[in-house]
Amino acid sequence: MNTRRELPESPYLAAASGRSPHRVPVWFMRQAGRSLPEYRELRAQHRMLQACFDAELVCEITMQPVRRHKVDAAILFSDIVVPLKAAGIGLDIVPDVGPVIDNPIRTLGDVQAMPALESPQVAPVAEAVRLLTAELGDVPLIGFAGAPFTLASYLVEGGPSRHHERTKAMMLGESSTWHALMTALTDLTIAFLQAQVDAGVDALQVFDSWAGTLSLTDYREYVLPHSSRVFATMAAAGVPMTHFGVGTAELLGAMSEALAPGAARVVGVDWRTSLADAAARVLPGAALQGNLDPVVLLAGWPVVEKAVRRVVEDGRAAVAAGAAGHIFNLGHGVLPATDPGIITDAVELVHSL
């Protein structure tokens, strides 16, 4: 059943779909997070994964930056390891460390023993989506998931990693095990995204946080087929889909290929790549999202104002050069030390330009 809302005036959905928005849309990755005192107050009482599986908490945390900053989109408060936890994989999110896996995946037998994700296991997430779509009014809700490669890296390494040694060793040296793992994680990612779509999200974003550690050759051989299946399957949902990674300048063309042809497609760009270069690298018909350096928000208003104006100008130039649209965002997530007042002022400035 299609529970999606009609939001014809949304500048975010317009830009993501290749239409002309009435203003430059803006939202921020990690806009619901530690930069907000109201978030810190809630999180002082609840562990991260506990919060991610509490529908009312997810709703409240997701709404906080929408109320405060008047951004043009909400993104569901969650974590990329939530579907792994929901499926029954032992893990925890350790403060100041990140996701830590109880029993890392190292063999084909480990892969074959992995549980699948069933929709009842993410019922709290779906309920949070329903609560949010009832409360958000004309603001669209973005659902999201981690991409198979990034999930695989956490599972194989056992936690965050600088060099992803075990992940790449499996990928390059045990390709049958690797592709079996990626197939299982692609199925899991699709199931998690589908549960969000069925509950009513208005758009999707897939985060491949660690894809930038790969060469283009390895990305095409070992990752692209699986990411492409995620987007090809989800294209039937009829919602805009964004593909984002960090340090992925050389991969932007391939990442745009992963997005299903004919769907509303957006490629996220980090601050290391100009929007002009990104527009030249992605396939025709893709919009761009980005790409302010998150650290700029720590540098004081005169610096922020200049940088925000530049990104808006660069976005307009990219659209003139052929990009389907531009959505203002950061090139990564909001840093915890960011003054929320600066974010509010940046949103107001983007809307005024």
Curated annotation (Swiss-Prot):
Location of the protein in the cell: Cytoplasm
Enzyme class: lyase
Gene3D superfamilies named in the record: 3.20.20.210
Classification via CDD domains: URO-D (cd00717)
Xref: NCBIfam families: hemE
Catalytic activity field: uroporphyrinogen III + 4 H(+) = coproporphyrinogen III + 4 CO2
Family matches, as SUPFAM superfamilies: UROD/MetE-like
Residue numbers marked as site, Transition state stabilizer: D79
Family: Belongs to the uroporphyrinogen decarboxylase family.
Keyword Disulfide bond: no
Gene Ontology BP term (one): protoporphyrinogen IX biosynthetic process
Subunit-structure text: Homodimer.
Domain of life of the organism encoding this protein: Bacteria
GO cellular component: cytosol
InterPro entries on file: UROD/MetE-like_sf (IPR038071), Uroporphyrinogen_deCO2ase_HemE (IPR006361), Uroporphyrinogen_deCOase (IPR000257)
Family matches, as PANTHER family: METHYLTETRAHYDROFOLATE:HOMOCYSTEINE METHYLTRANSFERASE RELATED, UROPORPHYRINOGEN DECARBOXYLASE
Annotated positions binding substrate: R30, Q31, A32, G33, R34, D79, Y154, S209, H332
Annotated pathway: Porphyrin-containing compound metabolism; protoporphyrin-IX biosynthesis; coproporphyrinogen-III from 5-aminolevulinate: step 4/4
Protein name (record): Uroporphyrinogen decarboxylase
The organism of origin for this protein: Mycolicibacterium smegmatis (strain ATCC 700084 / mc(2)155)
Gene: hemE
EC number: 4.1.1.37
Function: Catalyzes the decarboxylation of four acetate groups of uroporphyrinogen-III to yield coproporphyrinogen-III.
